[in-house]
Swiss-Prot record:
UniProt note on tissues of expression: Expressed in flowers, leaves, roots, and stems.
Residue numbers bearing the Phosphoserine modification: 8
Pfam family, one: OPT
GO CC, alphabetical: membrane
Transmembrane segments: 37-57, 61-81, 123-143, 148-168, 177-194, 207-227, 256-276, 279-299, 352-372, 410-430, 438-458, 522-542, 592-612, 621-637, 640-660, 673-693
Name of protein: Oligopeptide transporter 4
Primary role: Involved in the translocation of tetra- and pentapeptides across the cellular membrane in an energy-dependent manner.
UniProt record similarity statement: Belongs to the oligopeptide OPT transporter (TC 2.A.67.1) family.
Protein keywords: Acetylation, Membrane, Peptide transport, Phosphoprotein, Protein transport, Transmembrane, Transmembrane helix, Transport
């Protein structure tokens, strides 16, 4: 990559990757405020926010991203450009200004804004608004109530607060050329590919329709007729009476040795579509996954019986008593929604499955290793680029953007002030529902403000975004224990507002490269966020009130899809960090104090790698050892399971290694299109199945609809532990 000193041409970017991907031209006459943009953008945002929230409670929660909309809206946009009338007419109150439903051909700038709308509908890649989890755990797990208005304010303010941080930092991490945001180049490449002239017999649009129909038609098989195909765990079939064999072979509750799926939702759940992940990322995830699942976990469980691991399932996100029974969480919550210490001491300390304990330890290590790794391997580069961003000349893209009216700073200041005031009112006047005191909001906002700039710089220059959710949970758990909802509210305001800010800034940089007027970006992001958040809570409220025993796996009908795996982990985190508190889990009063050593191990790991790199500079493979990626490879487990990882790695390797290497022209034309079509086809069929047979509770009952047939995988292996449905040694 060229450095700033080596670079002198003022008409190109100083970053080589940007020079190769982003055009240095702009046509400011292209219309962006078109009927097509608003029509397709609002529909896309509404549809994605509905579908993503709808799927979020399912066992395999498919996340439909903006790429689906990017591909699907292209032919629709061209169709509207052909059929809409071109007549120009005036609008009341607009003077002599004229407006047309069809100002000309469907252009790339319209397409970008539609995709930004869609990105808001997918909560910027997260699926649904993170704060919806608070409403879910209150209603479905704790069995308490929260008002709709309190829930809506939580969702909207936590997202818009992130927008305020983004506005304050836009000048520092969007406009400078050296803040180049590598992930945006994928989007730029896709937009350019989609808008190139397509003279092939099999156009991208035709391929998309064919693949969508196939995906739509096939999903009825694993989605309704033969649900066992979601996790084909053949080891369990071969050893129907062996607990150990089923622990090893279960794709949903075990190590998943040999388990695979024929269900796209299982492939793309949690980790998103493997077709859009580069192979080097897949390889890093594979190494980290294999090390944990097939080496560390078996050794800790069967080899050392660490923390009495064999008293509990090997793979579970549930919480347990010391004798292996499921912990009765509601029993230790008093009428004030706080920890009942006497009832807690009666049940005893909370115990985790070996896998769940290791994931927290690896989470600690990942946080520490990320900071150390970035400081050692990228610190000088980040410092140089940030210095250049102040002193360096404007690049061609920043100069081209000067043609458009900038966003006044007072827009962001006003938004930030209003959001903080509304949030303070929420904490003061609805404190009985959210528990968080006003000083908690101030502390969370201060943490978000402090961390947003360095995290944005790291993401903009290295494409790594350190996850700081555990830090916020840990801090609030130490300061204000015994109050679960206060803890998760603190996490959402502190961590997620920062994460949202990074996502907003990423979109701003995409608009910067695509030469989208900044005020158009502002309004589309803001309107999309409000619309998506409102639809998220409306759909969640409907599902929580209409699906009987939703999220209660032990009370749901067999093989019900409404198990809420992500919210189960969110609930467990509220218990561990908020209700019981880290002192009683990872401190002197808990069983897992030794897990804190993972912080030190994670911090020292990159130092060792960096030292080896300095000692042996000719060994080119040493700096490729990326410990944050390796340690964080299984960050989505739980709720993700072994079958999700197995299938994601397999499919990603096929397409992004073999197809990419040996059929590159096909990959360039159709890979992203296929990914979008698979997501869309499954989404439409799943919704159709729910409204046609799901609401009527019409289900099939035969061997192929009774799960993966690994019922013994949930059993402990220690002697004398009694669990319903499990053999006693």
């Amino acid at each position: 990559m060229a450095t700033a000193d080596e670079f002198s041409d003022e008409d190109t970017s100083p970053i080589e990757e940007v020079r190769l991907t982003v055009t240095n031209t702009d046509d400011p006459t292209l219309p962006v405020w078109t009927f097509r943009m608003w029509f397709l953008g609002l529909i896309s945002c509404s549809l994605l926010s509905f579908l993503n929230q709808f799927f979020s409670y399912r066992t395999e929660p498919l996340v439909i991203t903006q790429i689906t909309v990017q591909v699907a809206t292209l032919p629709i946009g061209h169709f509207l450009a052909k059929v809409l009338p071109k007549t120009r007419f005036g609008l009341p109150g607009c003077g002599s200004a004229r407006f047309s439903l069809n100002p000309g051909p469907f252009n790339m700038k319209e397409h970008v804004l539609i995709s930004i709308f869609a990105n808001a509908g997918s909560a910027f890649g997260s699926g649904s608004a993170y704060a919806v989890g608070i409403i879910t755990i209150i209603k479905a797990f704790y069995g308490r109530s929260i008002s709709f208005i309190a829930g809506w304010l939580l969702i909207i303010t936590t997202q818009v607060l992130g927008y305020g941080w983004a506005g304050l930092l836009r000048k520092y991490v969007v406009e400078p050329a050296h803040m180049w945001w590598p992930s945006t180049l994928v989007q730029v490449s896709l937009f350019r590919a989609l808008h190139e002239k397509d003279d092939q017999r099999m156009t991208r649009a035709k391929f998309f329709v064919i693949a969508l129909v196939c995906s739509f038609g096939w999903y009825i098989v694993p989605g309704y007729l033969f649900t066992t195909l979601t996790s084909i765990s053949w080891v369990c079939w071969a050893f129907p009476r062996s607990v150990t064999a089923q622990q090893i072979g279960s794709g949903m509750r075990g190590l998943g040795l040999g388990a695979f799926t024929l269900d796209w939702t299982a492939v793309a759940s949690f980790l998103f579509s493997p077709l859009i992940s580069p192979f080097f990322a897949i390889a890093n995830v594979f190494i980290g996954y294999v090390l944990l699942i097939y080496f560390v976990l078996p050794l800790a469980y069967w080899g050392f019986d660490s923390y009495n691991a064999t008293r509990f399932p090997i793979f579970s996100s549930h919480l347990f008593t010391s004798v292996g029974n499921t912990y009765d969480i509601p029993a230790i919550v008093n009428d004030n929604f706080e920890l009942d210490l006497a009832k807690y001491e009666q049940q005893g300390r909370i115990n985790l499955s070996m896998f769940f304990a290791l994931t927290y330890g690896l989470g600690f290590a990942t946080i520490a290793s990320t900071l150390t790794h970035v400081a050692l391997f990228y610190g000088k580069e980040i410092s140089e680029r940030f210095r250049v961003s102040y002193k360096g000349k404007e690049d061609i893209h920043t100069r081209l953007m000067k043609r458009y009216k900038d966003i006044p700073s007072w827009w962001f200041y006003s938004m930030l002030a209003a959001t903080l005031l509304i949030s303070l009112a929420l904490c003061v006047f609805l404190n009985d529902e959210v528990q968080m005191p006003w000083w908690g909001l101030v502390f969370a906002s201060a943490m978000a403000f402090v961390f947003t700039l360095p995290i944005s710089i790291i993401t903009a220059t290295t494409n790594q975004t350190p996850g700081l959710n555990i830090i916020t949970e840990y801090a609030m758990g130490l300061i204000y224990p015994g109050r679960p909802i206060a803890n998760v509210c603190f996490k959402v305001y502190g961590y997620m507002s920062m994460a949202q800010a990074v996502s907003f800034l990423n979109d701003f940089k995409l608009g910067h490269y695509m030469k989208i007027p900044p005020r158009s970006m502002f309004l589309v992001q803001f309107i999309g966020t409000i619309l998506a958040g409102t639809i998220n809570i409306t759909v969640a409220w409907w599902q929580l009130n209409s699906i009987k025993n939703i999220c209660q796996e032990e009370l749901l009908p067999p093989n019900s899809p409404w198990t809420c795996p992500g919210d189960r982990v969110f609930f467990d985190a509220s218990v561990i960090w908020g209700l019981v508190g880290p002192k009683r889990i990872f401190g002197s009063q808990g069983n897992y104090a030794a897990m804190n050593w993972f912080f030190l191990g994670g911090a020292l790991g990159p130092v060792i790698v960096w030292s080896l790199h300095k000692a042996f500079p000719k060994r080119s493979w040493i700096p490729l050892v990326n410990l944050p990626v390796l340690l964080g490879a299984t960050a989505m487990m739980p709720p993700a399971t072994a079958v999700n990882y197995n299938s994601w790695i397999l499919v990603g390797t096929i397409f992004n290694l073999f197809v990419f290497r040996y059929r590159k022209s096909w990959w360039q034309r159709y890979n992203y299109v296929l990914s979008a079509a698979m997501d869309a086809g499954v989404a439409f069929m799943a919704v159709l199945l729910y409204f046609s047979v799901g609401m009527e509770e019409k289900s099939l009952d035969w061997w192929g609809t009774r799960g993966e047939h690994c019922d013994l995988a949930k059993c402990p292996t220690a002697r004398g532990v009694i669990v319903d449905g499990c053999p006693v040694k």
